[in-house]
Amino acid sequence: MDTKHIKISDYNYSLPDERIAKFPIAQRDHSKLLVYKHGVVSDDVFYHLPDYLPKGALMIFNNTKVIQARMHFRKETGALIEVFLMEPAAPTDYELMFQTTGHCSWLCMVGNLKKWKDGSLKRDFEIKGHSLTLSATMRRGEAGADGKAAPLAVGGGTNYWIDFDWDNENISFAEILEAVGELPIPPYLNRETQESDKTTYQTVYSKIKGSVAAPTAGLHFTDAVLADLDAHGIDREEVTLQVGAGTFKPVKSLEIEGHQMHTEYIVVHRRSLEKLLHHDCQVIAVGTTSVRTIESLYYMGVHLLKHPEVNEEDLHVKQWDPYDDGRDGGLVDDITPMQAIQAIVDYLDKNGLEALHSSTQIIIAPGYTYKIVKMLVTNFHQPQSTLLLLVSAFLHGDWHQVYDYALCHDFRFL
C-alpha cells in the first residue's frame, strides 16, 4: 500500500454529537468493552478486560499526567488573553521545569493574539497566604517600519516563546500552575472545564507531569482492574509520552502525505526495556500514545545499530522513518525487535544512562507493519484522524466492522 497517498476521506464515518462521551460514567471501569478477535466482534464490561488477556503478557501504560496548561490574563483594556503551554523551552526538561522557581520559558499557543501587541501580561493571585504577581512576556522579532515588533513564532508558526516571571523564589512553577492554571480538555467535548475534571481526566496511574491531554484509553482503568491484571499474571510496565495538543490536529490535506505530524517527547527507563526483552517484545499497549512510544523504540534501535555513534537527540523518529524512504530504509526486515531493543539497552550502558529521553513524530497508518505491539486497548477515535489510521493499520483495514458494531450497540465515543 502507498501509505503517503491514502485519502483521509476514506476514513470518515458519521458520529452524532450525542454519542460523544462528554463526561465519564460514575464508575470508570463499568464502561462498555468491545472485543475484536480473529475477525469476530463481541461486547462486555471493561472490568472483565483481564479475562481476555494471555497470562504472562506484558501490558504497557503511559504514566503521563495532564497539567493545568491553560492560563488566562486580562489586559488593562479588558481584553482576555489565553496562554496555552505547549512545550518547555527553558529549561527543556519537564521535571526540572516544574521544579524551577522565579523564572521559566515555554512555547505556547496564544488565544486572542491580536490584542497582545506589546508589553507583559500580569496576573495577581495568592499561594499559601502569599500574594504573588505572575508576568508573561512574549519574545518578539525586530521592529518593522511602523516601529512595532511582531511576535516571534516557532514550531511552524503556531507557537510563541513566552517568558514567565513571578516574585517569589520559594514558589515552584508547578505550584503556579496549580494556583492559576486550568486543566485543558479535548475540543471535541465542546464544554468548559469543570472542577471534577482534575480527577476524572487523569488516569489512576498518572505520575509524570507534562501532557496537555490525557491518554484517554487509560481512563477506564481502576485500582481494582489493575489488581485483577496482577491476579491474572499480566506483567505491567510504564513509559512516558507527553501528549501534546497536536494529537487533536485535524488532517486537512486530501492525502496524508500533506499532513505534518506533531512531535511528542518520550522517556523509557532501562527497566522497561529489559521487560520488553524478557517478554520477547510481545506487548499489549494501553492507548495510542503507548503504541507510538513502543513502536518508535524499534526505529531508534535500528538507527543505533546502523549508526552506533549517534547522540540521543539524533534518535528522534521522523514521520516517515518507518516507510520505504525512511532514513534507515524504512521496512528493515533484517533487524528483529529484540535486536533493536537490545541496541538501546547497550546504548544506555555505554553512556551510563538509566533512561532514554527522546522524541517521536511517527505516523502509523495502513501500510505500516507493527513490530512490537500485539494487542491494543484503545478508545474510539474521531473520523478522519491520524489515530483512526493507527487503528486501521492494527486491524488490517477492518475498522469499519468494529466502528459500525460500536455505533449500533450504544458505545460511547472519544
Located regions from the model:
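Surface-exposed, charge/polar-rich loops and edge strands
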Residues: 1-142, 147-414
